[in-house]
Amino acid sequence: MKIKSYKQNFISQRKDKKSSDFYYIFAYSAHGYLYRIFEVFNKHKMPVDLISTSEVNVSLTFESKYNSEELINELKEIADVELYASRASISLIGKEINQEPNIAGRAFSVLGEKGINVEMISAGSSRINISFVVKQELADLCVRELHKVFFEDG
């Protein structure tokens, strides 16, 4: 199944990312929880790339070039923190791509068949992209396999 409107759709990858997970069991009822997390990022002038949230978990990515030790230590005062280095973000980009049936399902099925674990998913309401995080050493394989599925007759 090719993505509709081939000329307006793309696959991108960005390497040298760090991914972090924040766990706080009472986050869903804690007023200002997200504010406190982003306040620390703001203090360190560290931009956040992708974000995914649930009631007790916040996952996000940022560039590896930033020194994260002090940042992570401050964030540990707010929540339990896990940091993962050597990550890449992959994005399927196109007009209303997240409205096209089975795009995400097909992408994740193909990646699963190749043994690629998707660690985080982020899709905004803009309908322009679906992004996800994988281990950096799998990023090139990920892009090749997605290209076969969506842009070739694979």
Predicted regions mapped to residue ranges:
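A conserved regulatory-domain signal marking ACT and ACT-like small-molecule sensing domains
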Residues: 1-154
